[in-house]
Amino acid sequence: MHKLSIQSTGAIAQHDLEKGYRQIAEAGFHCVDFGFDSFLQGWMIQNDNINKVFLRPIEEIWEDFKPHAELAAKYGLTFEQSHAPFPLKTPGRDNLNKKMMQATENCFAIAHRMGSRYIVEHPVHLWNAARDEQYAYNKEMYLSLIAMAKEYKLTVCLENLFVERNAHLFEGMGSDIAESVRLIDELNEAAGEELFGFCFDTGHANLLGKNMYQ
């Protein structure tokens, strides 16, 4: 059975959680793509401001998200997929990257408790790197997620991204579908099972003028 889903970001307000989940259910949706990335946004990560969100004891973090799980259950909704905070890795910032790995593992743990089967981990776009260097950087990043993906029974999904510079949009990592398929195949081979998949963002593809059929 196909399920109709909507992202939590923009649909559920923190000051009135129940209204958000009720309206989603009344609109006919079956599930919610939960945006952990709205609780730990990119600018917060780059400013190394992550301790108050996902770098706490897991039970303390769970208290923040438990109301979401309870209200979703009340209205017959599930969290089939989640979006993890990003970027997971930033070149040249090893200390920040270590914190983000721990924050990501905690995020995976909470996603598992909420019933997610898929979690989107955005690839990293490197402006000043050659295409093969960017590919290798992302492959190494995703390989580091294998153990936690297995532990929390999550399929890690890449996503097709766009990037912006000087008011122009460009293809980001993941937008070359053939390249993404090759990367996913290599990651699954390394994992020994299907732990990696793809979240196709039609909006991102439309912004870049992609041919949907192709």
Language-model-detected regions and their locations in the chain:
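N-terminal pre-domain/capping segments
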Residues: 1-117, 150, 185, 189, ...
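Acidic/histidine-rich catalytic cores of soluble enzymes
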Residues: 3, 32, 133, 144-214
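Active-site-proximal loop/turn and secondary-structure-junction residues that shape catalytic pockets
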Residues: 10-12, 36-40, 85-88, 123-127, ...
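A structural signal for well-ordered alpha-helical scaffolds and beta->alpha junctions
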Residues: 17, 65, 104, 142, ...
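A short acidic, helix-capping loop that chelates divalent metal ions and anchors anionic groups
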Residues: 42-44, 88-94, 127-131, 164-170
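Glycine-rich, often proline-containing surface loops adjacent to acidic residues and nearby aromatics
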Residues: 83, 118-122, 157
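Short, amphipathic alpha-helical segments
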Residues: 94, 98-101, 132-139, 171-178
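Hydrophobic alpha-helical segments and helix pairs
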Residues: 107-143, 149
